[in-house]
Amino acid sequence: MKYKIAEGQEIDFKDMDNSFFLIGLLNEFMNRYQVLADRFFCEISWKQCFLLICINLFKEAPTLKEVSEIMGTSHQNVKQMLIRLEKLDYVRLETDPSDKRKQRITLTEKTKKFNEENDAPSQEIMNQLFSCVDKEELEITINTILKLDAQLKLMR
């Protein structure tokens, strides 16, 4: 399998197992996506934006543990991002009234404004990115990644 790294430059991965190639490709893709998204969002990074998206998925203010689980990363990584986002007034960390050991994460008005300002431009970027992928290909890719994700969770 040949992979184009730049105009006129290709690397041949024919001797590499496809599973290893896929994991490398996913990492390379996420690195490129992160660079693009970091340039798009001025005040916060793509990973911080992803954290805000994950928090917003919950109906009630989630805990650090819940957000860490949905993001697939450590409590320490999430906590560091939350500290920065709290300083920038995107989130508030509040003690859970029913369990003082837990902290609940609440989105602020600044986050709501951020979402309103960035929803349409973000959708345009996603439309442009996925313009070369049809619906069936996208569904197959999603299902494959979901299977791999479930397997990773079993391997913990």
Where are the predicted features?
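Charged, amphipathic alpha-helical coiled-coil/dimerization segments
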Residues: 4, 83-142
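Hydrophobic structural patches
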Residues: 26, 52-55, 145
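C-terminal regulatory/oligomerization modules of transcriptional regulators
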Residues: 1-14, 136-156
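N-terminal leader segment of winged-helix/HTH proteins
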Residues: 1-42
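Alpha-helical linker/hinge and terminal dimerization helices associated
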Residues: 26-29, 33-37, 114, 118-133, ...
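N-terminal positioning helix adjacent to the helix-turn-helix/winged-helix DNA-binding module
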Residues: 18, 44-48, 110, 137
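N-terminal helix-turn-helix DNA-binding core of bacterial DNA-binding proteins
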Residues: 34-74
